[in-house]
């Protein structure tokens, strides 16, 4: 994509989520979560969605996972506006390596998203990505506190789209606290930027997450 045609845009978004996890065994787990996201400097609702995920450890520290996302997206641009219904599914491979209080973790994810109720001939070309993420985690001893630093690269693979290839990256810094009999609360800051695209949008992300897990074994 030529830079002479590129549009530079920037924004600040707010992301929040509540998640419930079910640990069926020491290898198999499920989770359900509700998400709410705002854009336009956290002044306009962007989307809300329900996500269901599962993960299975096939051998020590190596997991296979999958999930689905039911999305309501706020379209407030153009002649036809309103809430759109989108659906996304994903498959992923996760690996982590513990070094005392440090953890190295890696993820390879395939995701596919499209708007429901439309055909491809109606410009409903699915968004398909391969996502490559690596990170470093640190746990403070006997405190429940931890830090994570993550970097992710997005590779768009839908053949009909002229913006195919590596075209986005995201950096995230996260701090979390685990509370006994209450769950885990996380605060994070992310920076995301497009490249090799017509719309060179960049955004800052301020987020909060809460998760409570039940052990069934």
Residue ranges and their predicted role:
Residues 1-12, 214-216:
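Bacterial Sec-dependent N-terminal signal peptides
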Residues 7-67, 71-74:
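Start-of-domain marker
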Residues 12-14, 46-48, 85-89, 124-130, ...:
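Residues that define the transmembrane beta-barrel architecture of outer-membrane proteins
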Residues 18-22, 52-56, 91-95, 110, ...:
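Residues on the lipid-exposed face of transmembrane beta-strands in outer-membrane beta-barrel proteins
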Residues 26-32, 61-66, 100-104, 142-147, ...:
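Repeated loop/turn-to-beta-strand initiation elements of outer-membrane beta-barrel proteins
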Residues 34-40, 68-74, 97-99, 110-114, ...:
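Transmembrane beta-strands of outer-membrane beta-barrel pores
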Residues 103, 107-184, 190-192:
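Outer-membrane beta-barrel transmembrane domain signature
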Residues 174-217:
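Long hydrophobic alpha-helical segments typical of transmembrane helices together
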């Amino acid at each position: 994509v030529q830079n002479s045609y590129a549009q530079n845009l920037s924004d600040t978004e707010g992301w929040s989520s509540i998640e419930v996890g079910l640990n069926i065994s020491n290898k198999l787990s499920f989770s359900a979560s509700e998400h709410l996201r705002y854009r336009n400097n956290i002044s306009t609702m962007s989307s809300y969605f329900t996500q269901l995920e599962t993960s299975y450890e096939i051998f020590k520290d190596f997991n296979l996972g999958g999930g689905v996302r039911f999305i309501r997206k706020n379209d407030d641009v153009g002649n036809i506006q309103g809430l759109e219904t989108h659906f996304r599914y994903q498959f992923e491979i996760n690996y982590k390596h513990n070094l005392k209080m440090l953890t190295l973790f890696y993820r390879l994810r395939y995701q596919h998203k499209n708007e429901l109720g439309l055909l491809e001939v109606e410009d409903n070309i699915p968004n398909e990505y391969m996502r490559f993420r690596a990170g470093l985690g640190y746990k403070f001893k006997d405190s429940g506190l931890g830090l994570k630093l993550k970097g992710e690269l997005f590779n768009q693979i839908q053949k009909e789209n002229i913006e195919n290839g590596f075209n986005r990256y995201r950096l995230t810094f996260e701090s979390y606290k685990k509370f006994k009999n209450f769950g885990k609360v996380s605060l994070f800051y992310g920076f995301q930027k497009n490249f090799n695209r017509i719309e060179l949008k960049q955004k800052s992300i301020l987020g909060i997450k809460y998760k409570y897990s039940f052990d069934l074994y």
